[in-house]
């Protein structure tokens, strides 16, 4: 008997993703540090390998390492851009016919292959530049954006009421926060106690268990309910894919189409800033004047991941007294405040306090996805989440590349500039949401609008 709960797969995937990101960044940082100069890291040291005295030659050396790591991250992200875009869009779009499990399985295979390669890279001390090739190959199988998009579509398929969608998506974000918080908190101890090799092996093992669960235990309601036998050539499949995307916007009324585009713009611009700035936090914390070690970086990651929990609680409480759009405003403006505080953080206490305004950072992600799902038909959910995942993949890679490039160019004269820039960019989704509000956003009215359009389409077909 198949299980219709995707939460265990999300749990394992979130653990692997959260542990992979800081481990890979710090592994590359140490490799570049050791290969650039004659300085080595002391694995049992309680302080970071960081020099605060600007007149010291080590200070100039660590600034050079920061630039090299930022540029390497840029190269690695760009290498997976094109294959990631193509695979994400195709896999999630065809999930409406072939089931949500297919993109989950393929993206899990790619993640497992990448983690195994990280183990080999670390154990045999291969050139770390080979990470670029593994990123490029792994992106063909889809990435974590593909996996999350399939999971959210899987959940929406099971939700009948609109409020249930918001709460269920918030529950998933809460689960993500719980896992990422605990994993982030322990990531520094993984490095210190087990080293990089064993840590990467644990990641590979968790992804293998995740793949087994999806293959043999997870059911697929879309595939089970689908009775049509799709037999078409590859070219016809691509044509049908893009045709369905085109019809998603064409079949909508003018007001609904405008709202759909505006909400997509809001979602992607907010995603662009939050995802783009995320890797900079670790580099910022490793550099002077903070000079954090791997344990403090783990504490910072855990505190940042607490926003998943607080965002879930916020959505759960706010949903009884305010609309979705007001919750999104709260998340955007508190995140903006956190960016400004981070830009001026010069001590450990200030950096921890700067994390406090990020408590509702995840709220706009959950709320905007829910708002988008409410303005499309139930038969268009798969293609909608394919569009979202495609834009998130494009925006995510572009954002990380852009912010890494900006940080590399500005770290020497003002490391906090990138955070001030991100705070300014958050005005874009805020303004976009104001326009949505001015169109008299009302959840119930758009539900009725969709029903009216569906009945009109049915009558047209009957004629």
UniProtKB/Swiss-Prot annotation:
Cytoplasmic topological segments: 95-101, 157-170, 219-261, 316-324, 369-382, 437-463
Catalysis: reaction(s): estrone 3-sulfate(out) + n H(+)(out) = estrone 3-sulfate(in) + n H(+)(in); 25-hydroxyvitamin D3 sulfate(out) + n H(+)(out) = 25-hydroxyvitamin D3 sulfate(in) + n H(+)(in); cholate(out) + n H(+)(out) = cholate(in) + n H(+)(in); glycocholate(out) + n H(+)(out) = glycocholate(in) + n H(+)(in)
InterPro entries cross-referenced by the UniProt entry: MFS, MFS_trans_sf
Biological processes per GO annotation: cellular response to 2,3,7,8-tetrachlorodibenzodioxine; vacuolar transmembrane transport
Signal sequence coordinates: 1-20
One GO term describing the cellular component: lysosomal membrane
Sample GO molecular function, one term: symporter activity
Extracellular side: 21-73, 125-133, 192-197, 283-294, 346-347, 404-415
UniProt keyword list: Glycoprotein, Lysosome, Membrane, Signal, Symport, Transmembrane, Transmembrane helix, Transport
UniProt cross-references to Pfam families, sorted A to Z: MFS_1
Compartments, as annotated in UniProt: Lysosome membrane
Keyword Ion transport: no
Its membrane topology: Multi-pass membrane protein
Residues that carry a glycan: 38, 46, 53
Transmembrane intervals: 74-94, 102-124, 134-156, 171-191, 198-218, 262-282, 295-315, 325-345, 348-368, 383-403, 416-436
Family, similarity comment: Belongs to the major facilitator superfamily. SLC46A family.
Known function: Lysosomal proton-coupled steroid conjugate and bile acid transporter. Preferentially recognizes lipophilic steroid conjugates or bile acis as endogenous substrates and seems to mediate escape from lysosomes to the cytoplasm. Modulates hepatic cytosolic copper homeostasis, maybe acting as a lysosomal copper transporter and sequestering copper ions in the lysosome. Delivers pathogen-associated molecular patterns to cytosolic pattern recognition receptors as part of the innate immune response to microbes.
The name this protein goes by in its record: Lysosomal proton-coupled steroid conjugate and bile acid symporter SLC46A3
Origin organism lineage: Eukaryota, Metazoa, Chordata, Craniata, Vertebrata
